Amino acid sequence: SVAVAGAVIEGASLTFNVLQ
């Protein structure tokens, strides 16, 4: 669903920010 896709994108963004 759209909600799940949004959660996945948020998780990827958070991980990317931590790795930066």
From Swiss-Prot:
Keywords: Cytolysis, Ion transport, Membrane, Nematocyst, Secreted, Target cell membrane, Target membrane, Toxin, Transmembrane, Transport
Primary site of residence: secreted
A cellular-component GO term for this protein: other organism cell membrane
Subcellular location: Secreted; Nematocyst; Target cell membrane
Gene Ontology terms: biological process: killing of cells of another organism; monoatomic ion transport
A GO MF term: toxin activity
Keyword Transport: yes
Positions of the UniProt region annotated as Plays an important role in the hemolytic activity: 3-12
Residue ranges, annotated region (N-terminal region): 11-20
Domain comment (free text): Composed of a long N-terminal alpha-helix and a core region rich in beta-sheet structures. Before the pore formation, the alpha-helix binds the lipid membrane, partitions into the lipid-water interface and stabilizes the monomeric molecule on the membrane. Finally, it traverses the bilayer, thus forming the transmembrane pore.
Protein function: Pore-forming protein that forms cations-selective hydrophilic pores of around 1 nm and causes cardiac stimulation and cytolysis. Pore formation is a multi-step process that involves specific recognition of membrane sphingomyelin (but neither cholesterol nor phosphatidylcholine) using aromatic rich region and adjacent phosphocholine (POC) binding site, firm binding to the membrane (mainly driven by hydrophobic interactions) accompanied by the transfer of the N-terminal region to the lipid-water interface and finally pore formation after oligomerization of monomers.
Subunit structure of this chain's protein: Octamer or nonamer in membranes. Monomer in the soluble state.
Membership in a protein family: Belongs to the actinoporin family. Sea anemone subfamily.
Name listed for the protein in its UniProt record: Equinatoxin-1
